[in-house]
Regions:
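Flexible, small-/acidic-enriched active-site or ligand-binding loops
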Residues: 186-217, 228-231
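Extended amphipathic alpha-helical segments enriched in small hydrophobics
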Residues: 242-304
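Short, structured patches in soluble enzyme cores that scaffold and shape functional sites
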Residues: 125-127, 139, 150, 165-168, ...
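Glycine-rich flavin
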Residues: 37-48, 52-154, 158
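Glycine-rich phosphate/cofactor-binding loops in nucleotide/flavin-utilizing enzymes
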Residues: 316-358
Length: 358
């Protein structure tokens, strides 16, 4: 695929994403939900289709997609299988970090294998979001020591690399490092990383754990970035938009199933509303407050789309393992997963019928 001209390569990636979502992921989604396991064939299908490197620039071996092309592919994959896509989505943040890092040796070591999907990556940055932070970094002579808690880390046991972020105890800067998961000290040692499985009601196959980190040594050679806390939160707007693809992926699947159920007018209107919500989200990229509001609108739309599907399917939607039943649980996951406190507060106010705070 890399030998194609750029326009053809972009078109091929979109076509491949649709094929993987509809022919590989969605037919297996009920089984993934039932067993709590994403089959290894899903990861191979994504890698073979070139979908691990969609966020990489051309100079890093990527396709050089426009941002809207990246988000469309993310939506498409979410419409196939939420557990697979949510785990895979985390990978792109690591690819972006590696493509921008001043740490040339780390980039040379890891960028190419992450772009191709030969190495799969996850992230643990939620520990730096609250104040005081849950995850801290203390400077040593040749690196850092990370200590703290990361409450939700997906892909445990399936990813090869983990980008973990912590806040410097002296400057409050955010330090991000990429560590091979196979080398993390997980035994009961003074410098252990302990993983406790988190039992989720939806997307359980994401293999999500809670990490307790006690004195983890992080050499400078593994540090991918160091930014101020203000710069970190500014950069989070991109992450909010990428995670904003989750509700649109759910709407895509619900509308397709509404078409099958003979409810084409309802499906058409939901697609129109999704287009409007997507435009609002894209136009708010430079305004964190407006971005949260648009993300809340998208999450609410996903819930309404799956409610329409449940109503259309009737009693069948009450059967454990039906598409509508699974998607309804996944809508609750999408309401709160990968979201900031202000988004949750906004959703509470909107569902309660309270006015937005000014």
């Amino acid at each position: 695929m890399s030998n194609q001209d750029p326009a053809a390569r972009r078109s091929t990636l979109r076509t491949e994403a649709l094929r993987v979502a509809d022919d590989v992921l969605f037919p297996a989604a009920a089984g993934v939900d039932r067993t709590g396991v994403v089959p290894s064939s899903h990861w191979r299908a994504l890698a073979d289709a070139g979908l691990y490197g969609i966020a990489a620039p051309v100079e890093a071996g990527g396709p050089g997609l426009e941002f809207g092309e990246v988000t469309e592919i993310l939506e498409v994959l979410v419409s196939g299988c939420l557990s697979t896509a949510f785990t895979w989505l985390q990978h792109h943040g690591v690819v972006i970090s590696l493509s921008r890092t001043p740490n040339r040796s780390l980039r040379d070591e890891l960028l190419e294998p992450t772009v191709t999907g030969r190495l799969r990556a996850g992230v643990a940055y939620a520990g730096v979001v609250p104040s005081p932070p849950r995850m801290t970094a203390t400077r040593t002579d040749d690196g850092w020591v990370f200590t703290g808690h990361a409450p939700f880390v997906s892909g445990w046991g399936t990813v090869d690399l983990l980008q973990i972020s912590a806040r410097d105890t002296e400057t409050d800067d955010v330090i991000a490092a990429i560590l091979p998961t196979a080398e993390l000290p997980t035994a009961e040692l003074p410098t252990a990383v302990r993983a406790s499985p988190v039992e989720l009601t939806a997307a359980a196959a994401t293999s999500t754990v809670s990490l307790q980190v006690d004195g983890l040594p992080v050499p400078d050679a593994r540090v991918v970035s160091r930014v101020s806390i203000d710069e970190f939160f500014t950069n989070q707007n991109v992450g909010v938009r990428l995670n904003g693809t989750l509700p649109f992926g759910l709407v895509r699947r619900c509308t397709a199933l509404l078409d099958v159920a003979g409810r084409a007018p309802a499906a058409r209107r939901l697609r129109e509303r999704a287009d409007e919500a997507r435009m609002a989200l894209d136009s708010a990229m430079d305004d964190a407050t407006a971005l949260s509001a648009a993300r809340a609108d998208a999450a609410r739309l996903a819930l309404e789309a799956v409610a329409a599907l449940v109503a259309a399917r009737g009693g069948e939607a009450l059967l454990r393992g039906s598409d509508a039943e699974r998607l309804f649980r996944e809508a609750s996951f999408i309401l709160v997963a990968a979201s900031r406190p202000e988004l949750k507060d906004l959703l509470v106010r909107r569902f309660a019928g309270e006015p937005d705070s000014r």
